[in-house]
Amino acid sequence: MRVENNNVSGQNHDPEQIDLIDLLVQLWRGKMTIIISVIVAIALAIGYLAVAKEKWTSTAIVTQPDVGQIAGYNNAMNVIYGQATPKVSDLQETLIGRFSSAFSALAETLDNQEEPEKLTIEPSVKNQQLPLTVSYVGQTAEGAQMKLAQYIQQVDDKVNQELEKDLKDNIALGRKNLQDSLRTQEVVAQEQKDLRIRQIQEALQYANQAQVTKPQVQQTEDVTQDTLFLLGSEALESMIKHEATRPLVFSPSYYQTRQNLLDIENLKVDDLDIHAYRYVMKPTLPIRRDSPKKAITLILAVLLGGMVGAGIVLGRNALRNYNAK
């Protein structure tokens, strides 16, 4: 019984062993076909590597500008808005926000070109607005680094131009408001002067009618509009001449307004050097390209060539066996 079982077991496994051996024999006999297929695949892979565009990614990290970088801008805002000037921290957030928006707009424009360019900006740390990671994909390592630095500078210049334009518009508006305020105060001061002269002239008429030529009071502080004629016609005539040649009287706010106007007029916006960002890490020079990967490409070529060659050998032998039957 033991011998019969062994024979049965041998009968069950021999076909599989023979098939596997036969398969290996077929592949060995067709090894030249497989080798040629692998060589062809490697040649195609080398050709692909020769013509494929390389991709190198340069990366930089930016954040909001330092206080010193926006000192001139902050001073200009103080001159224009005075006590209503935003906090320095608010200005920093505004500037980096404008930089981010302008950079995103540029990235979208480059992506929609006939030959798209990949420029990206995103937070460096998840769930945190700052710092920001910006990157550019180029065909060479040096080109990617140079292009990224160029686009960062381009966006910074654009934001700078926009800020200068905003400042000039605000300066023009502030100048107009201050000039209007000065004119209003001057008109009020002139009206007060004219009113004072008319009041004295009216008192002079009363004094002449009452034939009061000399002062009738000892303390001028006690004189009111109704009793002004008691100063006498001689004093009133002298007062009219004095008031007519006397300069307009202004409040301290008038002179403060004039000072503010002079400060705004002396403000030189074109001389401001405003930066909307600060480097945490300057554009890197990539040392490894993103694609194509030579090693992976060649390994895949060998595997694919071997599989294709094996398929050709097995398929050809199967077709021969079928025709023989």
UniProtKB/Swiss-Prot annotation:
Provide one Gene Ontology biological process annotation: lipopolysaccharide biosynthetic process
Pfam families assigned:
Wzz (PF02706)
User: What transmembrane ranges does the database entry give?
Assistant: 32-52, 295-315
Identify the residue ranges that face the Cytoplasmic compartment according to the record: 1-31, 316-325
Instruction: Give the keywords, sorted.
Output: Cell inner membrane, Cell membrane, Lipopolysaccharide biosynthesis, Membrane, Transmembrane, Transmembrane helix
Q: Pathway, per UniProt?
A: Bacterial outer membrane biogenesis; lipopolysaccharide biosynthesis
The entry's localization annotation reads: Cell inner membrane
Q: How does it sit in the membrane?
A: Multi-pass membrane protein
Q: Which GO terms describe its cellular component?
A: plasma membrane
Q: Which residues form the signal peptide?
A: none
InterPro entries on file: Bact_polysacc_biosynth/exp, LPS_length_determ_N_term
The residues on the Periplasmic side of the membrane are 53-294
Q: Name one GO molecular function term.
A: protein tyrosine kinase activity
In which domain of life is the source organism classified?
Bacteria
Protein purpose: Confers a modal distribution of chain length on the O-antigen component of lipopolysaccharide (LPS). Gives rise to a reduced number of short chain molecules and increases in numbers of longer molecules.
> Which family is it part of?
Belongs to the WzzB/Cld/Rol family.
Q: Which NCBIfam families match?
A: PRK15471.1
**Name of the protein:** Chain length determinant protein
